[in-house]
Regions:
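ATP-dependent carboxylate activation and anion-phosphoryl transfer catalytic cores
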Residues: 1-228
């Protein structure tokens, strides 16, 4: 069973920054094609449990890169458009339970976008460990924040810089983008620098709004804006 695709093209140094589903780069036929390819591939190799197959897409063709035999950071956007709790299903299947649905049971509704909120300088991407002096996460319909951060929390310098995931969903991509703009405005993190301003900048660009971006877009945008 496949749960649709995710577009992870907004990235820097091969590190994902923003993810969304469904991909604005695919039409319905291409979406159905890659979904069926993945479903058949998993069936052929006899794989059981959650997994993610990654592809490059260029000139209307898919190029397989790798398979990650686990959940991905961006799994909440898939949960948002399918209504399936992937973490729960992973645990059930690992315990020996059968998958509780078939491909025909899987439906896709709306659009979802995730921003990875990192404790980094939004211009240089230098890590910014330190103490959180103020923390206010956005909320409301179609807004989800996954994080363990709180006011007074000290971010250590030893690990990955991601401190939160902001996930928004809406009936359409435009609705999700409107919700994302509001959520980013409401998101307050003080005491350290974060990539919130970068996300606000990205989603205000015409190329992103139109869905006309690729894996090189962010680095090209940063080079144009900051000369780096």
């Amino acid at each position: 069973v496949h749960l649709g695709e995710r577009d992870c093209s907004i990235q820097r140094n091969n590190q994902k920054v923003i993810e969304e589903t469904p991909s604005p780069a695919l039409n319905r036929q291409q979406r159905e094609e890659i979904g069926e390819i993945v479903r058949k591939a998993i069936e052929k190799i006899g794989y059981t449990n959650a997994g993610t197959l990654e592809f490059l897409f260029e000139d209307g063709r898919f190029y397989f890169m790798e398979m990650n035999t686990r959940l991905q950071v961006e799994h909440p956007i898939t949960e948002a458009v399918t209504g399936i709790d992937i973490v729960r299903e992973q645990i059930r299947v690992a315990s020996g339970a059968a998958l509780g649905y078939t491909q025909d049971d899987v439906t896709f509704s709306g659009h979802a976008i995730e921003c990875r909120i990192n404790a980094e300088d939004p211009e240089t991407f230098a890590p910014c460990p330190g103490k959180i002096t103020e923390w206010h996460a956005p909320g409301g319909l179609g807004v989800r924040v996954d994080s363990e951060i709180y006011s007074g929390y000290s971010i250590p310098p030893f690990y990955d810089s991601m401190i939160a995931k902001l996930i928004v969903s809406g009936k359409t991509r435009n609705a999700a983008l409107m919700r994302l703009r509001r959520a980013l405005e409401e998101f307050v993190i003080e005491g350290v620098k974060t990539t919130i301003p970068l996300h606000q900048d990205i989603i205000s660009q015409a190329e992103f709004i139109d869905g006309q971006y690729n894996i090189h877009w962010l680095e090209q945008f940063m080079a144009r804006k900051y000369g780096k």
